[in-house]
Design a protein with these regions (language model features):
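Class I SAM-dependent methyltransferase SAM/SAH-binding core
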Residues: 49, 56-102
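A short acidic, Gly/Pro-enriched loop at the edge of an enzyme's catalytic core
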Residues: 104-111
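A short His-aromatic
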Residues: 120-122
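A short glycine-rich, Lys/Arg-flanked "PGG" loop and its adjoining helix->strand segment in the class I
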Residues: 129-141
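Residues lining the SAM
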Residues: 115-117
Length: 258
């Protein structure tokens, strides 16, 4: 996981990240959907790039289907966990610490993914456009780019100015949100059990809501096009209560390779 503007995020709790996320994310279903998309589009299974890879859940599952996997994130601690997972699965791979808005990998990829609303962490519009340009420059002509977002509805109505909490034997957290316009700031306080005591640490995360139409205009400007959109990686109707949209993106054949 990474943010568009450099920011220390997801560093202190990389080792408990999977436990916190597991209840809300069905990685296997999401990854199988992406693999099915590749098969249906006859995508070559040579090079796979996972952006804002976090602890490598996408990388280590989808990467089994590709000859080589590259996992990118800004958090060294997340990359360390991802690297362990990739090696454990026997996947030919490397991890790279880079900002997804300014990629410089000197190769192109058949599949690029950016999951778990990492695109929403890109707050500035110019950085968002740079992100899509970077993807376009690293995507092969017949390749596919799959990313997902938290919708405007989720950010403004579900997250909004609300508070949440999580309480298990080893981990407790309190999550307070503040919504200002299109941007939600999420302050999280964690208490993680270590021996007989709980260690506290704090994280602040910021996401921005983007309309589908604005995202599509940025994608087009970067020389790509929207092939289809999925409701949380499922072929269901997208409506005003949809919380997550996955975009399936291809190079626009009408545009020159950038």
């Amino acid at each position: 996981m990474e943010v568009g503007e450099p920011m220390e995020c997801y560093n202190d709790f990389a080792y408990i990240y999977d436990e916190l996320i597991a209840e809300d994310v069905n990685y296997k279903t999401w990854c199988n959907t992406i693999i099915d998309i590749c098969n249906n589009l006859n995508i070559e299974k040579r090079d796979y790039l996972d952006l804002a890879c976090g602890t490598g859940n996408f990388s280590s599952y989808i990467g089994k289907n590709f000859a080589f996997t590259t996992a990118v994130d800004l958090s060294p601690s997340m990359l360390s966990v991802a690297d362990e997972k990739l090696k454990k699965e026997g996947i030919r791979s490397k991890v790279v610490c880079q900002n997804i808005c300014n990629l410089s990998l000197n190769k192109k990829f058949d599949l690029i993914t950016c999951g778990l609303d990492s695109t929403n962490y890109i707050i500035e519009e110019e950085n968002l456009k740079s992100y899509f340009r970077s993807v376009s420059q690293h995507l092969r002509e017949n390749g596919v780019f799959v990313f997902d977002i938290n919708t405007e509805y989720k950010i403004k109505e579900i997250l909004g100015d609300n508070s949440f909490n999580y309480n298990e034997d080893d981990v407790v957290y309190i999550w307070d949100n503040v919504l200002q316009g299109d941007v939600v700031t999420m302050d999280l306080t964690f208490f993680v059990k270590k021996g007989q005591v709980y260690e506290r640490f704090d994280e602040t995360h910021v996401e921005r809501a983007y309309s589908e139409s604005y995202l599509e205009s940025c994608i087009k400007e970067a020389g790509m096009k929207v092939e289809r959109k999925l409701n949380c990686y499922e072929d269901k109707i997208i409506d005003d209560k949809t919380e997550r949209i996955a975009f399936v993106i291809r190079k626009d054949e009408k545009k020159d390779d950038r």
